[in-house]
Design a protein with these regions (language model features):
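Acidic, Ser/Thr/Pro/Gly-enriched alpha-helical scaffold modules and adjacent low-complexity linkers
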Residues: 2-576
């Protein structure tokens, strides 16, 4: 390496270290928010970032470009007034380490609510109003909250509070906002959080891995610490939107759509506004909860996105992604996609929305709302739930009740599909009696589809659902999807870590004083190094191992080293 390049490298390291220290200073803020961007329309530059709060945050050029284009509706002439929606932005700048609180959040939250190391969520509030004092005659500006957390409901409400206040008061209020967020408690799964912000107290519940456990009641939330707030906003869910409202126009095809999302099929949602398409994409992803959607999703996607070419290629098989779009250009560019959902632009009443047809011929794709696909579902519809939902429309049942009915049905359907898989994967664990403290850590057996199918006759979905159909065919397709790969990788990792813990616990209780008798020095040294290696691996893999087990393992190491000559003791102590 030359002197110049070495000097440059050291400078870069110093810059990175400085940024990390500043980031740590704002750790409480970054538990919730990466940054807040103000995006404006510049006559010479077009969309441009006017300011980033806090000021130390550096976005890469590509991240800045994506934020700018996603912050404004694609064809904003029809979006007068205020427009809210959310986006997903690929992270490609400097690697930002999650805070300790976010790492702990990921460990304790359900998989479908965990952070994604490769993406940010962006929550957008766009305002366009006439203003004759400005050169173009319009005021156009967006506030974008960028975060790792998928709390669509909470951040939507935060955006709705922050943006109008900023438009009214200016940068001074934004400085106050970031300081106040920096005082918030961390997002702890299983707890109610109280988040004060410019006179409003937001209260909501952060779900834990037992996502079906009873959420604390409003009465429990009512006992909040004393905050100086002019009003309180209680959110029964931090992450759930109004599922039924989003899916109302296509509710007849809810089981077909559930299969498409489950199988990670390419879907494009075409709508007249970013709000409509982002809400629909969110509702589709939520259909398979508690299973995590592991393919890509873009609640709102534009022709300027850095992945535009990647997703609009003429390849025979489009990528596994759900795209939400508004630009009419996509109607032609993506017409070869196998599954297209068109959402009505108008505010037609519910009864009209439910007359949307399904087309079997993609060539007739036009402006009519509907589900355009040639996909043939593996399972039959559950007519009982559809009748309930249609009856609810006729009787004007409240939307939140309709959403609760639909959500419960879809969760039960997903669980009926996944329980046989969960039951089977548990059988891949070696028997505890076969786990020896003196041998290599065993690994789970490999997944065998034929062995799994053999379990279905006695322990298949029919135990928990009355829905008929080709369940085996659905499983076969599922095994080729990113959703299966993601689920299996997570479960296999959990089983492997569990085996590590079981073996280390056995090793910590083993009688090594007896074991050392008759052993060669090389065997004893090897055992010490292996125990240390196992401990180091648990640290790297973040395996949850108790403090007492670690202490006992150190005692076992001491049991061995006490029998070794002093020169070997010194070498081992030096290496530890």
């Amino acid at each position: 390496m030359s002197v110049a390049s070495s000097s440059k490298s050291k400078k870069m390291d110093n810059v990175n270290n400085k940024e990390e220290k500043i980031y740590e200073k704002w750790e409480c803020f970054h538990n919730w928010v990466h940054c807040i961007c103000i995006v404006t329309f510049d006559l010479e530059l077009g969309q441009a970032i006017e300011a980033i709060y806090p000021g130390h945050i550096m976005l890469s050029e590509q991240e800045r470009s994506n934020v700018c284009y996603l912050a404004f509706p694609d064809s904003n002439s029809g979006c007068m007034g205020d427009t809210q929606y959310h986006v997903r932005i690929r992270q490609n700048g400097a690697v930002v380490q999650d805070t300790k609180a976010l790492k702990e959040y990921d460990r304790r939250s359900p998989p479908f609510l965990q952070c994604d190391k490769d993406y940010y969520w962006g929550y957008v509030y766009f305002r366009q109003v006439k203003d004759k004092s400005l050169p173009r005659g319009y005021f156009q500006k967006s506030i974008v909250i960028i975060t790792k957390l998928p709390f669509v409901n909470l951040f939507g409400e935060l955006c709705a509070l922050i943006a109008p206040e900023f438009f009214e008061v200016g940068s001074a209020v934004m400085e106050a906002i970031v300081r106040e967020i920096d005082q918030w408690p961390p997002p702890v799964p299983g707890q109610i959080v109280h988040l004060p912000l410019i006179g409003v107290l937001f209260q909501t519940y952060i779900p834990n891995q037992n996502y079906k456990s009873t959420v604390p009641t409003i009465a429990a939330i009512d006992h909040a610490p004393n905050f100086h707030a002019t009003r309180r906003l209680i959110l029964t869910s931090a992450y759930e939107g109004d599922m039924f409202r989003s899916l109302a126009s296509v509710v007849s095809y809810v089981h077909l759509l559930w299969e498409l999302v489950l199988l990670s099929e390419p879907i494009v949602v075409m709508a007249g506004s970013p709000t409509g398409c982002s809400e629909m994409v969110q509702a589709l992803i939520a259909m398979i909860a508690p299973l995590k959607y592991c393919a890509d999703q873009r609640p709102y996607f534009t022709i300027h996105d850095s992945e535009f070419k990647e997703y609009t290629t003429d390849a025979p098989s489009p990528p596994a992604v759900i795209l939400g779009v508004t630009n009419p250009f996509f109607a032609k560019t993506l017409q070869h996609w196998p599954h297209i959902i068109r959402i009505s632009n108008g505010s037609s009443n519910e009864n009209q929305k439910y007359k949307i047809k399904k087309s079997e011929n993609l060539k007739v794709l036009d402006s009519k709302p509907g589900v355009y696909t040639q996909y043939k579902p593996f399972l039959q519809k559950d007519k009982t739930i559809l009748k309930k939902l249609f009856r609810g429309i006729q009787t004007k049942r409240p939307g939140e009740v309709q959403t609760a009915l639909l959500k419960r049905h879809l969760i039960e359907l997903t669980e009926s599909f996944m329980i046989p898989l969960e039951r089977y994967i548990a059988t891949l664990m070696p028997l505890q009696k076969d786990i020896s403290p003196f041998k290599a850590t065993p690994i789970p057996e490999l997944f065998n589809p034929d062995d799994f199918f053999a379990t279905l006759s006695s322990a298949g979905p029919q135990l928990t659902t009355g829905i008929k159909g080709d369940w085996v065919g659905l499983y076969r397709r599922f095994f080729r999807s990113p959703n299966f790969s993601g689920w299996f990788h997570t479960r296999y990792t959990e089983l492997s870590q569990k085996l590590q813990v079981i073996q280390l616990e056995a090793l910590s209780q083993a009688d090594l004083k007896t074991w050392v008798q008759g052993k060669q020095e090389v065997e004893l040294v090897d055992m010490v190094l292996r125990i240390r290696q196992k401990l180091e691996k648990t640290y790297i893999d973040e395996v949850p191992i108790g403090k007492s087990v670690k202490e006992k393992l150190q005692e076992r190491i001491n049991d061995i080293t006490h029998t070794l000559p002093d020169d070997l003791k010194d070498i081992l102590n030096h290496e530890s």
